[in-house]
Amino acid sequence: MDFDYENAKFSMPEKRIFDSQGTLDFQNSVAMVRIQYHLQKYITLCKGQQIPDTIKESFFTNIVVELLKRLSALIDETPPERMHSRYGNLSYRDWQTKFQNQLENWLHELLPEKYNNSIIELSYYISNAFGSKERIDYGTGHELSFLAVIICLDMLKIETIKGPALLYCFNSYYDVIQKLILTYKLEPAGSHGVWGLDDHFHFSYILGATQLLDVNTSLIPKDISNTRLMEQNSSSNLFCKSIRFINVVKSGPFSNHSPLLYNISRSVHTWHKMQQGLIKMYKVEVLNKFPVVQHFWFGTAFFPWTSYGNNHSLPIYQPAENNDDADFLTANNATTKMPPPLSTSTSRFIHRR
C-alpha cells in the first residue's frame, strides 16, 4: 500500500470517534483500510515463524527495541508505591510522566532525521500503546496503538520488515507490557471479565496462532490448558506467551477463569481455524467496538479520518458543548455504553454450517 511521505502533511492526532456512528464510519475510512491491509500483511509474514532469540541489527528493530529497552529501564527506576489496593498503583502515573517527557527527544534520536516530520503523529500512537495514565489500565485498544506504531514505521519505508524481526519486536513489546501490568497492577481496560477472550490482549493470539501454521508441531489448541506446555513454548510463540501470562495473573482452573478460551480450544481442532476465528473476532470485538476505538485518534497522514471511497473527510459526531443534558450527543441514537458481555459460547468465534 503506497504512502507518499514527501507530500504527506502531518498533524497532531485528534479524537474523531465519539459514538457508535463514528465507529461505523471508521469501518469505511482510509485508516481502517490501512490497518486491515497491514494486519493481513503481518499475518502472512509471521506464518510458520518462531520468535528468534536474537535479531540482526536494522533501522526498524533498533528503533523499536531501543525504545522498549528505555521504557523497561524506566520501570526499574520507578518502583511501585506500597499500597493495599489490588489494582492501580499510583507510581504508574510517575512512570507515564517520565515516559511522556522523554519520548519526543528519544524519537529525534532514534529516527533518521528525514522522518522528523512524522514524529507529531507517531508519538501519539506510541504514547497510547502503554496503557492509560488516568485510568491506570491496559487493554486491546492500547495493543492496537502499538500495531499502529509498527504500521507507521512500515509506511515510512525505513526498511523492508521481515517476519522474525516483526515477532521479535512484538515479543519485546509484550515483555514490557507484562512487566507494567505486574509492577503497577494495571487494571484490564474495558474487560468483559470471564466472558472475554483475554483481559489485556488479542492481537498476540492472532500472531501466535499464525506462527503454528504450516509447521511440524505437536501443539494442538486444546493444549492451552496444559500449564507446562505453555511455559515451555512461551519464549518462541506469542499464543503460548499470552496463555502463560494468564496463568501468572489468575488462579484456579483454566476453564473457570478463562471459559471462552477454554471452550474455543475444545471446539476448534486446528490452528488454521483458530487463527481465522481470532481474526474474525478481532475485527468485531476490537476494530468495531466503540469502547475500544474511541481512544484511537486520527492525524492527517498515517491514519486520516477520510472516506476510502471518495477520500472526503468523514463526519464527526462530536458531543454538543454546554448541553444541559450531557447524555445527548449531536448524532441521533448515539451510544457510548459498554456493549453486553460476550457469551462463553464459541458461536461468535466460528461459523457453523
UniProtKB/Swiss-Prot annotation:
Q: Does the keyword Iron apply?
A: no
Mention any one GO cellular component term assigned to this protein in its UniProt record. protein phosphatase type 2A complex
Report which superkingdom the organism of origin falls in: Eukaryota
Q: Which reaction does it catalyse?
A: [protein]-peptidylproline (omega=180) = [protein]-peptidylproline (omega=0)
Q: What is its main location?
A: cytoplasm
The EC number of this protein is 5.2.1.8
Pfam families from the xrefs?
A: PTPA (PF03095)
Could you tell me where this protein is found in the cell?
Cytoplasm; Nucleus
Q: Which UniProt keywords apply?
A: Cytoplasm, Isomerase, Nucleus, Rotamase
Q: Which SUPFAM superfamilies match?
A: PTPA-like
The entry lists its GO molecular-function terms as:
peptidyl-prolyl cis-trans isomerase activity; protein tyrosine phosphatase activator activity
* Class of the enzyme per the UniProt entry, highest EC level: isomerase
UniProt record, GO biological process: mitotic spindle organization
User: Could you tell me where the Polar residues compositional bias lies?
Assistant: 343-353
Region of interest: Disordered: 331-353
Which purpose does this protein serve, as stated in its record? PPIases accelerate the folding of proteins. It catalyzes the cis-trans isomerization of proline imidic peptide bonds in oligopeptides. Acts as a regulatory subunit for PP2A-like phosphatases modulating their activity or substrate specificity, probably by inducing a conformational change in the catalytic subunit, a direct target of the PPIase. Can reactivate inactive phosphatase PP2A-phosphatase methylesterase complexes (PP2Ai) in presence of ATP and Mg(2+) by dissociating the inactive form from the complex.
Give the record's family classification: Belongs to the PTPA-type PPIase family.
Protein name as annotated: Serine/threonine-protein phosphatase 2A activator 1
